[in-house]
UniProtKB/Swiss-Prot annotation:
Participates in chromosomal partition during cell division. May act via the formation of a condensin-like complex containing Smc and ScpB that pull DNA away from mid-cell into both cell halves. Component of a cohesin-like complex composed of ScpA, ScpB and the Smc homodimer, in which ScpA and ScpB bind to the head domain of Smc. The presence of the three proteins is required for the association of the complex with DNA. Belongs to the ScpA family. This is Segregation and condensation protein A. One of its GO terms (biological process) is DNA replication. Keywords: Cell cycle, Cell division, Chromosome partition, Cytoplasm. It comes from Lactococcus lactis subsp. lactis (strain IL1403) (Streptococcus lactis). It holds the Pfam family SMC_ScpA. The gene is scpA. InterPro entries: ScpA (IPR003768), ScpA-like_C (IPR023093). GO terms for cellular component: cytoplasm. It comes from the Bacteria. Transmembrane segments: none annotated. It is found in: Cytoplasm.
Amino acid sequence: MIKEINIKIKNFEGPLDLLLHLVSQYEMDIFEVPLVPVIEQYLIYIQTMKELELEVAGEYMLMASQLMLIKSRRLLPTVTETFIEDTEQLEYDLLAQIDEYRKYKMLSQDLDELHQERSHFYSKAKTEIITDETVLLQDKSALDLFLAFTKILELQRQHFQDENTKIAAEKFTIADKILELSTRFTEQKICKFSDLFSSSTNKDELVTTFMALLELIKNQQISFSQGELFGEIILERKETSE
């Protein structure tokens, strides 16, 4: 029942935007960033998009194929000096694209801030209309939530594969998981993101739990925060006003 909710990531404009976010987590010069871990995170992200039955645009898949080429060349034994030079050139070209995109984003943000300042003196800014059935991940912190789930999904997938015992397939619905999470947060105001998935028995339950969480976040029943880079995401029940 995964398709009950549609997910969109606002202001996430393409593969370079995702790569820039992944690279920025290292807080160092772009050309010094370890590229293989970034590539692995990107590929896991794409795989998770498919697991959630979300449409993956062609440009993401094209970038994925380029990244897989770079990663495979990194893993192959050194053949010739030309091979090394070609691989290094591929990596440099990719990082140069990301750096160029970063500069574009900075300029775009500056222009947007200028536009916002000018709009105060003129007409009211237009309002974006969002349909009720859409779960909108509104900023890059929400992207961090999504990326955190990709890591859990990858780890748990391996765990499920390693399990020798076969458990009868159980059907999970988003509605049931919403009720389960609501009950949990009634009893426990604060919870670690990773703890929500610790008792999941299969991939379907993982995904359904995540979709239910997104619905609760959309309805402003749950908030989330991340205290430090790569740190644990903390979920908290929002108090309802009487």
